Every structure is written in C-alpha cells, then in structure tokens.
Amino acid sequence: HSEGTFSNDYSKYLETRRAQDFVQWLKNS
C-alpha cells in the first residue's frame, strides 16, 4: 500500500527536519 509507505517516509522526513531545526536552534542560542 503506497499510502502507508508515504506517511512513514513523511514522518521520518518530519523527524529529520525537526532534528535539523533543533541543531540550528542550539547553534543560534
């Protein structure tokens, strides 16, 4: 089912984005 893999990849993508934003925030503070 392609929808399941899409949402799984999307949540992984969001986690990566959040992690990168967090690293940027740590550097800036």
Curated annotation (Swiss-Prot):
Q: What are the subcellular locations of this protein?
A: Secreted
Q: What induces it?
A: Produced in the A cells of the islets of Langerhans in response to a drop in blood sugar concentration.
Q: Name one GO biological process term.
A: response to starvation
* GO MF annotation list: glucagon receptor binding; hormone activity
Q: Note whether Secreted occurs among the keywords.
A: yes
Q: Which Gene3D superfamilies match?
A: 6.10.250.590
Annotated GO CC locations: extracellular region
| Keywords recorded for this protein, A-Z | Hormone, Secreted
* KW Secreted (keyword) present: yes
Q: What does this protein do?
A: Promotes hydrolysis of glycogen and lipids, and raises the blood sugar level.
The family note in this entry says: Belongs to the glucagon family.
**Know the name of this protein?**
Glucagon
Which species is the source of this protein? Answer: Platichthys flesus
